[in-house]
């Protein structure tokens, strides 16, 4: 029996040593969307201009800034996401009159953004015109 035990154990050992190679699946051709772009390929995002004006804030964001610390103190063990959820619940509960305060702040911030954006766009336009005029003067030399 000892000889059969040895042969039985050696066969199980040899099975353990054999590595199974993973089956490679053939690569799928990328799907082409209606616009002719290949799906799955990421397009490169152009970098944000650091001089561009910051976008205006919504009424809820102004509300969140005011109430986040209060909720965080009353729920110290909550995660950032849970606090955000609680803020959303509080925002839904407050009256329309209370929301008007934050809507007014948001409207003022939007006016600020529109003015800054207008100035920023004009600045970009003058820069591009200056560059194009300097390019044309270089060609005439």
UniProtKB/Swiss-Prot annotation:
Subcellular localization: Nucleus; Chromosome
Molecular functions per Gene Ontology: chromatin binding; DNA binding
Record-annotated DNA-binding residue ranges: 53-121
GO CC term, one of those recorded: chromosome
Regions of compositional bias (Low complexity) in chain numbering: 1-12
InterPro entries per UniProt: HMG_box_dom, HMG_box_dom_sf, HMGB
Entry keyword set: Chromosome, DNA damage, DNA repair, DNA-binding, Nucleus, Transcription, Transcription regulation
Superkingdom to which the source organism belongs: Eukaryota
GO biological process: chromatin organization; DNA repair
Region feature (Disordered): 1-56, 117-141
Listed Basic residues bias regions: 17-46
UniProt cross-references to PROSITE patterns, sorted A to Z: HMG_BOX_2 (PS50118)
Subunit structure: Probably associates with the stable spt16-ssrp1 heterodimer to form the FACT complex.
Role played: DNA-binding protein that induces severe bending of DNA. Required for DNA-binding by the FACT complex, a general chromatin factor that acts to reorganize nucleosomes. The FACT complex is involved in multiple processes that require DNA as a template such as mRNA elongation, DNA replication and DNA repair.
Family designation: Belongs to the NHP6 family.
UniProt protein name: Non-histone chromosomal protein 6 homolog
Gene coding for it: nhp6
């Amino acid at each position: 029996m000892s000889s059969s035990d040895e042969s039985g154990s050696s066969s199980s050992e040899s099975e353990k040593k054999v590595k199974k190679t993973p089956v490679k699946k053939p690569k799928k051709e990328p799907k082409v969307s209606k616009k002719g772009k290949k799906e799955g390929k990421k397009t490169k995002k152009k970098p944000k201009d650091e001089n561009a004006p910051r976008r205006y804030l919504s009424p809820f964001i102004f509300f969140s800034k005011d109430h986040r610390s209060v909720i965080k103190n009353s729920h110290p063990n909550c995660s950032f996401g849970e606090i955000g959820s609680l803020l959303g619940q509080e925002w839904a509960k407050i009256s329309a009159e209370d929301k008007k305060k934050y809507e007014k702040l948001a409207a003022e911030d939007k006016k600020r953004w529109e003015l800054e954006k207008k100035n920023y766009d004009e600045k970009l336009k003058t820069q591009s015109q200056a560059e194009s005029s300097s390019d044309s003067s270089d060609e005439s030399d």
